[in-house]
Amino acid sequence: MSRPRILIDGDTLKLEEILQVARNEATVELSPDAATRVRASRALVDRVAAGDTPAYGINTGFGTLAEVRIDKKDLRDLQRNLILSHACGVGTPLPLPEARALLLLRCNVLAKGYSGIRMETLALALDMLNRDVVPVVPERGSVGASGDLAPLAHLALVFIGEGEAFYQGQRMPAKQALERAGLQPVVLEAKEGLALVNGTQAMCAVGTLLQLRAESLADIADVAGAMTLEGLLGSHKPFIPEIHDVRAHPGQKDVAAHLRRILVDSELVESHVNCSKVQDPYSLRCMPQVHGAAREGIAFSRRILEVEVNSATDNPLVFADTERIVSGGNFHGQPISLAMDVVAMALTQLSSISERRVEQLVNPSLSNLPAFLAKNSGLNSGFMIAQVTSAALVAESRVLSHPASVDSIPSSAGREDHVSMGMTAALKGRQVSDFARSCLAIEILVAAQALDFRLPLKPGKGALAAYELVRSKVPHMDKDRELHRDIEAVSQLVDSGELLAAVRSATA
């Protein structure tokens, strides 16, 4: 079956399209208008390179070496040396989806026509994507200005036949990967090395996939919370529209409406209409307020990313229409750094309130259910340590929620005296999202056990769909067993989208 094709024009790339390419589920093609812009900007660079006027990155050194003039005969070596010298990354390589997203995003910014790249070089990048040649990019080494220099240098190594790449998932020398794909490396001309390494695409690649995952986890948090509410015989009244209309934060209203859909047709709520309990704990009653605030933080990040992935973040920028090549600071990753910190904090709050709901479920004095939801408690410990694991993940998430965006370490002999730490923010946000996924999986698993004790009464339609899917993969726990596998099974339902799909189908 042929893959859908995404047109790259530098202006209209969507986050969801980035995910498609990251998963190798779509091919890419350069738009004709973008090709025209690329050729026009390259023509200006060629004219400047042929002249004697100094132009940063074309016939000068880089950073604090910008005042050093480079002889015309050395311009190719200048660009090659830039790539080689900046490939200083360390750590594990970016996962393949993030590395593909990185390559795509660099193609998109080059397609805007402000970088001065040659069509031959951009065509190689597009061919690499379509033939599954993915650069090996160590994930550590960027301070987020001048953009993501080290990660992008590792990306650019493959263009010149250096470094390493994955070809169809197999790691090998870059030159071999290109040969297997029927491609040839390029010799970089004036400015091309700089055009490949200057920008925010690494933090945006990690950030885009984090963003889409965070949006999914925000929905999962509502499902988990609704299941817990039903297992604890909680009230639906805190979610009525009137309460949220008088404090009209959009995220809060959205969560309340989502919870109402998940809880519709609940048999459990009718079973305790006249109970003596007056109010539920905050972790249940305040789900719209807490989950809603997290959603709004995540929505803020989406707005930033949607602009950034379609922005020219090179330096200098080539304005072919006015025949100017101008140095600026569009490579500075501060917008992304702030956005990624907000996502991490939002996900940590979802994990934190989830862990508190798990405590409500396993604590017999709060749940009026068997201690730790175990039959024959004492002999069996039930879900005691599942709550401890959740607490550990929340604690580490809180540490990782310290903002990277307020940090800065000067570099390049003081020329680059303020940096964004955007890649740091994105990477720690990714880790926080892993923890949030696990926390919510634990809550769903524990809530399913609680719902077993409420049978034959059934929860609302959405909660029931989630419960039944979980039970199709993980049986009720009659006696102690290794819970790691159960947590992983539910985590897989979360990551695959299967759980959300089941809930959405039931509540459509």
Swiss-Prot record:
Cross-link annotation 5-imidazolinone (Ala-Gly), location: A145-G147
Entry coiled-coil feature ranges: none
Substrates-to-products reaction catalysed: L-histidine = trans-urocanate + NH4(+)
Localization per record: Cytoplasm
Molecular-function GO terms, alphabetical: histidine ammonia-lyase activity
Pathway: Amino-acid degradation; L-histidine degradation into L-glutamate; N-formimidoyl-L-glutamate from L-histidine: step 1/3
Post-translational modification: Contains an active site 4-methylidene-imidazol-5-one (MIO), which is formed autocatalytically by cyclization and dehydration of residues Ala-Ser-Gly.
Pfam families documented for this protein: Lyase_aromatic
Residues with the 2,3-didehydroalanine (Ser) modification: S146
Keyword Transferase: no
CC annotations in GO: cytoplasm
InterPro entries: Aromatic_Lyase, Fumarase/histidase_N, HutH, L-Aspartase-like, Phe/His_NH3-lyase_AS
Family, per entry: Belongs to the PAL/histidase family.
Protein name in UniProt: Histidine ammonia-lyase
Protein source organism: Myxococcus xanthus (strain DK1622)
Protein encoded by which gene: hutH
